[in-house]
């Protein structure tokens, strides 16, 4: 493992499998009466969020606290950033406080890389989402969910997703989740297909390690997992499709379309979902939908990432003693 986690593309196959295997052990903590390990006791982790977040911020905070880290939550609103303070000044302030790791979400693509390589701060940096660029821990938790469902919890240990067929549907253009998943799933040996209207595909997508299709119905019968992506209107300044109804008709997943998928196939969504647009309530509430599992798995993945970045060399959680209740 490198010192930072900035992009899913930076991970080797062995790195990714190590994280997934470590997360499998971290998941056992959730079954304990006391959901806590002493692994990062005495370490300080800062959640540096310049962009609104619910799931990711809470997930990281839960992961940090379960590892016994000291947690500092920073949001741009109400801080000196709202008064014009730069990322450099903020980083140097955190450096002066002696933090060990920074989890950063930023609207500017490349901000986590800048923080990690600038020399402003001597700490591990984890990218929690930067603009439309990358969201590596989301890709890892998605791959973790796929491996658990498609290979098995115990059977999946040490294994990747070789030969699995994954379909990503929706707003690829504005999605850091799509980019991260394509990078990681390719590294893990999966075959990825993107399905979207031409207006929601980025320039240069033909160079990505995946296939591109405009026909969802022809792709579904060949998919082991289908991941639906929200249309990110907050990043749009023009009309990318005629109407929501037309988009849903061509690219939304309903019960009839889900029936075309293989019996073992799963439906995924990184959240937040827009029911009635990219996914119907029937599909979202079905047993094949893994949205809630993804949230649960996100905590385990982020525990694994923090553990490995801050000194862990191998999956050793099963040998660690839980903190005794006082």
UniProtKB/Swiss-Prot annotation:
Residues that hold carbamoyl phosphate according to the record: 55-56, 105, 135, 138, 271-272
Taxonomic superkingdom: Bacteria
EC number in record: 2.1.3.2
GO biological process: 'de novo' pyrimidine nucleobase biosynthetic process; 'de novo' UMP biosynthetic process; amino acid metabolic process
NCBIfam families per record: asp_carb_tr, PRK00856.1
Subunit structure: Heterododecamer (2C3:3R2) of six catalytic PyrB chains organized as two trimers (C3), and six regulatory PyrI chains organized as three dimers (R2).
Function: Catalyzes the condensation of carbamoyl phosphate and aspartate to form carbamoyl aspartate and inorganic phosphate, the committed step in the de novo pyrimidine nucleotide biosynthesis pathway.
PANTHER family: ASPARTATE CARBAMOYLTRANSFERASE, ORNITHINE CARBAMOYLTRANSFERASE, MITOCHONDRIAL
Protein name: Aspartate carbamoyltransferase catalytic subunit
Organism of derivation: Streptomyces coelicolor (strain ATCC BAA-471 / A3(2) / M145)
Species classification: Bacteria, Bacillati, Actinomycetota, Actinomycetes, Kitasatosporales
Gene: pyrB
């Amino acid at each position: 493992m490198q010192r930072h986690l900035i992009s899913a593309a930076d991970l080797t196959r062995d790195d990714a499998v190590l994280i997934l295997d470590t997360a499998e052990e971290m998941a056992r903590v959730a079954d304990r009466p006391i959901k806590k390990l002493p692994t990062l006791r005495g370490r300080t982790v800062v959640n540096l969020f310049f962009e609104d977040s619910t799931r990711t911020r809470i997930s990281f905070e839960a992961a940090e606290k379960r590892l016994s880290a000291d947690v500092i939550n920073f949001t741009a609103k109400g801080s000196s950033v709202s008064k014009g303070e730069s990322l450099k000044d903020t980083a140097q302030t955190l450096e002066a406080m002696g933090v060990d790791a920074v989890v950063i979400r930023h609207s500017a693509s490349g901000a986590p890389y800048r923080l990690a390589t600038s020399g402003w701060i001597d700490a591990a940096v984890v990218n929690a989402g930067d603009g439309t660029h990358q969201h590596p821990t989301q890709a890892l938790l998605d791959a973790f969910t796929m491996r658990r469902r498609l290979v098995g919890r115990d059977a999946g240990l040490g294994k990747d997703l070789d030969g699995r067929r994954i379909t990503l549907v929706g707003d690829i253009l504005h999605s850091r989740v799509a980019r991260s998943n394509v990078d990681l799933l390719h590294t893990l040996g999966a075959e990825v297909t993107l399905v979207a209207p031409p207006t929601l595909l980025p320039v240069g997508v033909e160079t990505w390690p995946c296939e591109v299709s405009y026909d969802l119905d022809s792709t579904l019968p060949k998919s082991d997992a289908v991941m639906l992506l929200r249309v990110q209107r907050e990043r749009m300044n023009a009309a990318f499709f005629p109407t929501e109804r037309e988009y849903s008709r061509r690219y939304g997943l309903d019960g009839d379309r889900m029936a075309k998928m293989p019996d073992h196939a799963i439906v995924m969504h990184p959240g937040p979902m827009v029911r009635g647009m990219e996914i119907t309530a029937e599909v979202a509430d079905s047993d094949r939908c893994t949205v809630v599992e993804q949230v649960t798995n996100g905590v385990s993945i982020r525990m694994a990432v923090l553990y490995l970045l801050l000194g862990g060399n191998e999956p050793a959680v099963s040998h660690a003693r839980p903190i005794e209740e006082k």
